[in-house]
C-alpha cells in the first residue's frame, strides 16, 4: 500500500516523528518538575530570565545548522518555556498550601464545550490528576456551588480584549465570600458551527452567548438578515444546533466545543479585535498564600469618598510604594445611586512589605476596602533573544 502511495508513506514517517516529539516533551516536563523541586529547596525564583535568553540564543544557533528559522525556534520554545514556568509555579503552590492534587470539582458556565469549560479543563490539567465537571446555567449558580460546598473551585471569565469587562462577574465579586486563587488567559477563536452540509446564504438563525456576538459584531453585520438568538452559554448554543439538525441554524463557539457536539466549522471568524483573549479567574472558599518565588497578583475592591480627587489620592498610594496597577475597573454600587466600587489588579504579593504599607494607608483614606485574593500571575511574558 505504501509503495503505491508515497504520500501515505511520508505521512506515516511524520506521525512516527510526532509520537517521538510528544514523548520528549513529556520527558522535558518531568525534568521541569525536578527543576521546580530543586528551586524549592534552594529558594530560587521560578523564572530565570538570563537562563531563558541563553537557552533561546543557543537553540537558534543550533537551529541554523539544521536550516530552521530563528522565528520558528523562538515561537516554539517560548511556548515550551511558558509550560515549564507554569508547571513549576503549580508545584510550589501545591507545596506551600498543602493542596491535594488528586481531584477537584470545578464549577463553570454551561455544559461541556463552553469556553469556561475549556478554561476549567486547562486549569485542572496543570493542578489536579482528576477533574470533576460541574456545569452551571448562570454565573450566580457557579458562585453558589462553591459557597455551599458543592464544588471546590469556580472558573469564571472576567474580561475580554474585544468586548471588555464581564460585568455580571464583577457584580457578583462585590458580595461573595470566595477568594480569587488563580487566573488563566484563553485564546478565543470563534467559529460558525453547523450540524451538516449548508452554506452562509442558507443560514437564517445564529445562537450564542451575548459575549461572542459582541466580539464578532463586524462579521455579523455582513448578514443583517440573520436572526440573533441569545443562550446562557456557547455550549448551550451548540447543543441547540446539534439537536435541531437544520441547515438554517448555526452556533457561535469554539471548534473544540463544536467537536464535542458533532458540529462542523462552516466559517472561522475573525473577531473585531484580531488578538482575542479572555482572562478567567479561579475562586475558592479559602484564600491561599503565594510563594515569594512566584510572581503574584493581588486584586482589591474599594470604595472611595465622593469628594473630588478621592480616587487619585488612592492611586497615588500605589505609586508612592512602587506598586504597578495592571487593571482598574469601576462598577455601580447597587442601592447607592451614582456611587461606584473600584476593582484593582496590582502586580504584587499581598505579604510583601510595600503591599502591606499600601493597604494600611488605603484603609485610612477609603470608605471601604476588601482583598479579593492574592494568586500566582500566569501572564508569562516571553523572553526575546538579543
Which residues does each predicted region cover?
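Domain-level signature for soluble enzymes in the chorismate/prephenate branch of the shikimate pathway
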Residues: 1-386
Amino acid at each position: 500500500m505504501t509503495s503505491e502511495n508515497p504520500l501515505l508513506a511520508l505521512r506515516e514517517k511524520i506521525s512516527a516523528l510526532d509520537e517521538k516529539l510528544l514523548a520528549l516533551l513529556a520527558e522535558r516536563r518531568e525534568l521541569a518538575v525536578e527543576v521546580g523541586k530543586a528551586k524549592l529547596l534552594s529558594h530560587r525564583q521560578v523564572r530565570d530570565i538570563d537562563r531563558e535568553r541563553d537557552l533561546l540564543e543557543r537553540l537558534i544557533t543550533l537551529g541554523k545548522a539544521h536550516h530552521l528559522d530563528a522565528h520558528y525556534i523562538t515561537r516554539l520554545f517560548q511556548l515550551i518555556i511558558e509550560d515549564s514556568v507554569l508547571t513549576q509555579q503549580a508545584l510550589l503552590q501545591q507545596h506551600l498550601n498543602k493542596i491535594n492534587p488528586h481531584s477537584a470539582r470545578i464549577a463553570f458556565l454551561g455544559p461541556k464545550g463552553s469556553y469556561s469549560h475549556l478554561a476549567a479543563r486547562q486549569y485542572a490539567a496543570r493542578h489536579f490528576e482528576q477533574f470533576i465537571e460541574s456545569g452551571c446555567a448562570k454565573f450566580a449558580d457557579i458562585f453558589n456551588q462553591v459557597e455551599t460546598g458543592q464544588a471546590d473551585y469556580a472558573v469564571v471569565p472576567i474580561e475580554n480584549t474585544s468586548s471588555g469587562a464581564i460585568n455580571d462577574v464583577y457584580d457578583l465579586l462585590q458580595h461573595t465570600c470566595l477568594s480569587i486563587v488563580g487566573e488563566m488567559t484563553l485564546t478565543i477563536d470563534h467559529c460558525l458551527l453547523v450540524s451538516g452540509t449548508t452554506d452562509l446564504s442558507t443560514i437564517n438563525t445564529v445562537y450564542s452567548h451575548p459575549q461572542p456576538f459582541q466580539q464578532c459584531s463586524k462579521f455579523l453585520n455582513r448578514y443583517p438578515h440573520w436572526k440573533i438568538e441569545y443562550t446562557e452559554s456557547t455550549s448551550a448554543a451548540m447543543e441547540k444546533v446539534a439537536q435541531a439538525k437544520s441547515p438554517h441554524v448555526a452556533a457561535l463557539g469554539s471548534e473544540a466545543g463544536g467537536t464535542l457536539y458533532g458540529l462542523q466549522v462552516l466559517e472561522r471568524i475573525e473577531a473585531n479585535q484580531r488578538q482575542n483573549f479572555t482572562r478567567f479567574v479561579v475562586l475558592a472558599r479559602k484564600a491561599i498564600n503565594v510563594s515569594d518565588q512566584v510572581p503574584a497578583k493581588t486584586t482589591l475592591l474599594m470604595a472611595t469618598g465622593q469628594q473630588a480627587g478621592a480616587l487619585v489620592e488612592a492611586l497615588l498610594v500605589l505609586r508612592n510604594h512602587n506598586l504597578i496597577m495592571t487593571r482598574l475597573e469601576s462598577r455601580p454600587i447597587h442601592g447607592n445611586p451614582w456611587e461606584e466600587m473600584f476593582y484593582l489588579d496590582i502586580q504584587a504579593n499581598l505579604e510583601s512589605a510595600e503591599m502591606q504599607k499600601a493597604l494600611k494607608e488605603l484603609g485610612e483614606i477609603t470608605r471601604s476596602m476588601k482583598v479579593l485574593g492574592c494568586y500566582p500571575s500566569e501572564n508569562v511574558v516571553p523572553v526575546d533573544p538579543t
